[in-house]
C-alpha cells in the first residue's frame, strides 16, 4: 500500500520551524484515526466521534494539535493505492475493483475535546461511501456495491498492517531525532531473528543485508543479536573472525546508521517517516545511507513501501523531485520541485564540475562541510573519511589528515608560525 503520486523515497526540505515535523505528524494522525468507528458504522458526513483519548495515546496533547491562535478545523485529504494481493492476504475479497481510495477526514476542537469525522470516502471513483451511492462510472458498467462490513474492514486495513497476524502493527511510523541505539531496539532485532513469523524474520534478514553495505568501514564480519538471560537484556555486536565488538564501542556514525536501519525495519510499518537522517553523519555516509534506503530497504520484500524524510541535506535525493515547505501569509505551503534545485533549497552551493571526463565534484558548503573526491581521500590516507586539520598559509589553506599533521609536528617541534583552524 502507498500514497498515490509519491515516490518510494520522498524528501521534504524547508527552513527550521516551518512545520516539517508537523507535516509528518499529520500523516501519522491520518493513518491512526482513519479507521475510527461510531458504533457499528463510521462517523460519516455530519456525524463525529471523540478521539481525544486516542491522540493522548499517540503522545499528543489533543487541543494543541490545532493552530493556537486560530483553532480552525484540520482537514486531511489523501489518495491511497492498494495492492490486490495484499487485500487478499488481509481477507478482503470483493467483486468490485478496489485499488484506489480517496479519503478526507476532519478534526475539530469542541469544549476541550477533539471530534473526528469522515467527510469523504470514495472507492475507485465509482462508489461514494458517505452517501452510500454509486457514482456514474461509464456506460454499460455495473460495479458491485461493497458491503458495510467490507468498508469497515477496508479502513482497518489502512490503519493496521495485515501481514502481522499475532500483533497489531500500525501502518505509519514516525522516527524522530532521538534515536540512539537502545536495548529495546536490540531486543526487537533479536525477537525478529528468532520469530516464527516469516514477515518478522525477513526484517532481520533485511537488517543484515542493509548493514553489509558498511563492511568497508566495519571490516569483514556481520552483526549479531545476543540475549543475555542473566541480565535479561539484548545487545547488538559486530562479529569478525577475531572478536565480537559491542555496538557502543563502534563509531557514532555507525551507531546512527544501525539505529536508523534497525528502527526503519522494526517499526514493521508500511509507510515510515524519518526526521533529519543526516544528523551525526558525514556527507559521504549520508549518501551511503541513501543508497541503502533505495536499493535494499524501501519497496522491497520485508521493507516499507514508502518513506518520508525531512532534511537539511541534499544527500538523500533519489528521484526526480523533492518537496519544499515554505512559509506564506496564509500558512506553510508544500510544493513539488525538481531535484536539480535541492542544493539551493538547503543552502548548499550548486556543484561545479571541473573539465575532464573523470573529473570529480568538490565543494565547501555554507555550513563548512568539505567534499573531496576519492583520489584526494587516498592521498590523505582517508579512503573512508576521517579527521582532518587545516593550516593557514600565505593566501592559501592546506588540508592534512590528523596523522599527516602529527608527522609535521614531529618533524618541526619548534615551528609555531602556522595557525591551526
Regions found by a protein language model. Give the residues of each.
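Short amphipathic alpha-helical segments
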Residues: 19, 199-207, 285, 368
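RecA-like P-loop NTPase motor core
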Residues: 298-299, 314-421
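Extended helical coiled-coil dimerization/tether regions that scaffold
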Residues: 81, 119, 150-249, 254, ...
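P-loop NTPase switch/coupling surface
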Residues: 1-180, 274, 279, 330, ...
Amino acid at each position: 500500500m502507498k500514497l498515490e503520486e509519491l515516490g518510494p523515497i520522498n524528501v521534504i526540505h524547508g527552513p527550521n520551524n516551518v512545520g516539517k515535523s508537523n507535516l509528518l505528524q499529520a500523516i501519522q494522525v491520518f493513518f491512526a484515526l482513519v479507521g475510527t468507528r461510531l458504533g457499528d458504522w463510521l462517523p460519516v458526513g455530519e456525524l463525529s466521534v471523540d478521539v481525544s483519548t486516542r491522540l493522548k495515546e499517540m503522545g499528543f496533547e489533543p487541543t494543541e494539535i490545532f493552530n493556537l491562535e486560530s483553532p480552525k478545523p484540520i482537514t486531511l485529504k489523501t489518495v491511497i493505492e492498494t495492492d490486490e494481493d495484499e487485500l487478499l492476504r488481509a481477507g478482503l475479497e470483493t467483486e468490485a475493483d478496489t485499488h484506489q481510495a480517496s479519503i478526507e477526514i476532519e478534526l475539530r476542537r469542541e469544549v476541550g475535546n477533539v471530534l473526528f469525522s469522515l467527510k469523504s470516502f470514495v472507492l475507485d471513483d465509482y462508489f461514494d461511501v458517505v452517501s452510500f451511492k454509486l457514482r456514474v462510472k461509464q456506460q454499460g458498467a455495473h460495479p458491485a456495491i461493497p458491503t458495510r462490513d467490507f468498508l469497515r474492514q477496508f479502513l482497518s486495513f489502512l490503519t493496521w498492517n495485515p501481514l502481522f497476524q499475532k500483533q497489531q502493527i500500525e501502518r505509519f511510523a514516525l522516527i524522530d531525532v532521538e534515536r540512539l541505539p537502545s536495548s529495546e531496539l536490540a531486543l526487537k532485532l533479536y525477537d525478529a531473528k528468532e520469530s516464527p513469523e516469516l514477515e518478522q524474520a525477513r526484517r532481520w534478514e533485511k537488517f543484515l543485508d542493509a548493514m553489509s553495505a558498511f563492511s568497508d568501514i566495519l571490516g569483514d564480519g556481520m552483526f549479531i543479536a545476543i540475549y543475555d538471560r542473566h541480565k535479561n537484556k539484548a545487545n547488538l555486536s559486530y562479529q569478525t573472525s577475531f572478536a565480537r565488538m559491542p555496538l557502543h564501542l563502534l563509531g557514532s556514525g555507525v551507531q546512527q546508521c544501525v539505529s536508523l536501519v534497525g528502527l526503519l525495519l522494526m517499526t514493521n510499518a508500511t509507510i515510515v517517516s524519518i526526521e533529519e537522517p543526516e544528523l551525526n553523519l558525514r556527507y559521504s555516509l549520508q549518501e551511503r545511507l541513501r543508497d541503502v534506503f533505495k536499493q535494499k530497504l524501501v519497496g522491497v520484500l520485508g521493507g516499507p513501501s514508502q518513506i518520508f524524510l525531512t532534511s537539511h541535506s541534499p544527500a538523500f535525493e533519489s528521484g526526480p523531485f523533492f518537496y519544499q515547505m515554505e512559509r506564506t501569509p496564509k500558512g506553510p505551503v508544500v510544493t513539488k520541485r525538481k531535484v536539480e534545485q535541492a542544493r539551493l533549497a538547503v543552502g548548499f552551493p550548486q556543484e561545479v564540475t571541473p573539465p575532464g571526463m573523470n573529473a570529480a565534484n568538490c565543494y565547501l558548503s555554507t555550513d563548512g562541510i568539505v567534499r573531496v573526491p576519492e583520489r584526494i581521500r587516498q592521498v590523505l590516507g582517508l579512503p573512508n573519511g576521517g579527521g582532518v586539520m587545516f593550516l593557514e598559509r600565505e593566501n592559501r589553506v592546506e588540508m592534512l589528515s590528523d596523522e599527516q599533521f602529527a608527522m609535521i609536528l614531529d618533524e618541526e617541534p619548534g615551528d609555531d608560525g602556522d595557525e591551526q583552524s
